[in-house]
Amino acid sequence: MNHTRHGETVLALYPTTRGLGFVVMRSPLSPIDWGTRDIRGSGKNTQCLEKIATLIDAHQPDAIVLEDPTTPGGTRSTRIKRLVRAIAALADSQAIDVHAFARSRVVKSFEASGAKNRQEIAVLIAKRVPAFERFLPPKRRLWTTESARMSIFCAAALAITFFGPIEG
């Protein structure tokens, strides 16, 4: 399904072990707000939900977009799966549409541009959205952990998938 609902405010969220990345967009290449929220200590899901509630209050999104953590072969932790369900319940309680895309669907929406993995998708997004260029993390080495900034690009990829693929 191709969503071409430009003008609709979309909050894309990408929860991680360290917190979450988010992007707010009204069209596929025009972000309004973005960033990461670092969450430490116990009660990470509760803290994440509080941050998300603040984002919802600030931006009044028409839709929330998430990665589907239940996709067969997925590697999301049990905590993240619970958090995604809680985010969906929070959105439902505020009459906000929730859209969850499998990682394979996100990758497919960037196929025509030649991007096949997370890093290539992030590079493509940074080229298309100048505001994101300075946040592009360096290519991850096998022995390093993924940069927290990559969650911004994962969230942006989800939002762009919602609006429809970008070409070239």
Residue ranges and their predicted role:
Residues 1-168:
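Phosphate- and other anionic-substrate recognition elements at nucleic-acid/protein interfaces
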